[in-house]
Amino acid sequence: MTDYLDTPISWGSEIINGFVPSQYKDQTKFLHPPEFSKTPMFEGTVKEALLRKLSNPLGYDLSFDKLVEQKYQKGKPIVFVVDDYTRPNNHTKVILPIMIEKVLSLNVLKEDIRILIATGTHRLPKESEFTKILGEQISEEYRSQIVSHDCDIEGVYVGESDAGTPMEFDKLAFEASILVPITDSELHYFAGVAGTIKEICPGIATRNTVRQNHPKMFDRKLGFHPGCKLGGTEENPVITDIKNMVNILKSKVTIFGIDTIVTEGKIVYISTGDLVELHDEAKQHIVKMRTLRLPKAAGIVVSGMQSWGINLYQAGKGIHAAWNAVKHDGKGEILAVAPLPDGIGNANYEQVMKETGDMPLQEALEYILDNYCTTETFKIGNQKPVDTMRIVKMIGEGNLKMISDWDAEQLRKYYRVDPIKNPEESPVDTLRRAISKYMSKNPDELIYIMDDPGLYVIIE
């Protein structure tokens, strides 16, 4: 009877385990964030650390308490901005209750609290997802005060950015006494670092604003601009434009940010204050905390997705992370583990992939860049085919395997992946079969397991 290693990864809200035969113990490595990144960068509890940071925020010459005293007007709400259902929201469920308690203690009326869900261009959350985002108590107690951003409703126009991006944001931001984004910073595959300023754009921006900003990521020859990469911010035209937009918005709306870094579900870093300064500070920490330097690429990488396994669009983050860890010689395989209960997750992504499904890979890539990735033609979702195709191009067609419950025929026909899970199989059985098959032909190869799409692997 075959024994299996302890390698727990996510399958939707479940944890699956026991799929790497123990005979490959010496060749298998579970990729975790560096050990130091698991140690909190503060003393005491999260609440104690947060309260200290509120007293001495970045970029402000007064405390949060004094800011509320100066800016709050009855009938003009304190608006907390939080992530949507596509994110784990470990930080939201901890920080938001503390902040609500805090503003109530500062004589903010309970009816003057609003919670704005920063959906960006994602679908609106279902009411059943509010608990996942906010926790049971807050989602129930403040149900009537929760607002979901809708990017297709006309926003408030505040001019153009220096790069010519029209700036339109959710009207609730302009009704606020103070806008309080609560974020967690992570590496991002084209914005460099997510969190902080991205809670404004794309978080609460209109579709028109996002579709003018995001095409700045593309390069006709390379697919993506060289500066648009995990951890890249200095020469990144997308994030540079967003920074500029936030700086302009700050002159019209009082914004006080709360940022965290979460490692393996626990908050290990907290800072507060000016949103742009928070972004710059978080970048210095997150790159160190999420970068793994390894001497050799793996033959096979198993990539769990955590909450990003909800659809193929979001699962692309885990695929991208695995791409950095796998061999690029046409012999390595990525096993992307994502149930995909919401299917593809983006209509534009779906349209572009179906339109180019029969084209050779390079022809399809160039066609998409020419016809769907200009400022005139770009729609949110059009960037994902470019990323998928450059990954497939580098690892080899047929080497991106998908373990999913979604329509295998469509995945195979249109999305440049090889769906390998049979309907009657469990994901564990599929992984056992795929790993055993690969290793029987490549017995000396390394196996990497990852369950964190925010990891940045560098092969030295």
Give the residues covered by each predicted segment.
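Short internal beta-strands
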Residues: 111-121, 334-339, 399-405
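Membrane-embedded hairpin module used as a gating/binding unit in multi-pass transport
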Residues: 223-308
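Short glycine-rich or small-residue beta-strand-to-loop segments that form or flank ligand, phosphate
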Residues: 76-89, 114-121, 301-305
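Histidine-anchored nucleotide/phosphate-binding helix
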Residues: 88-108, 315-327
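Extended hydrophobic packing segments that form well-structured cores
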Residues: 1-35, 397-460
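C-terminal catalytic subdomain
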Residues: 312-400
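An N-terminal, well-structured beta->alpha segment
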Residues: 27-72
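An acidic, phosphate/nucleotide-engaging active-site surface
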Residues: 125-194
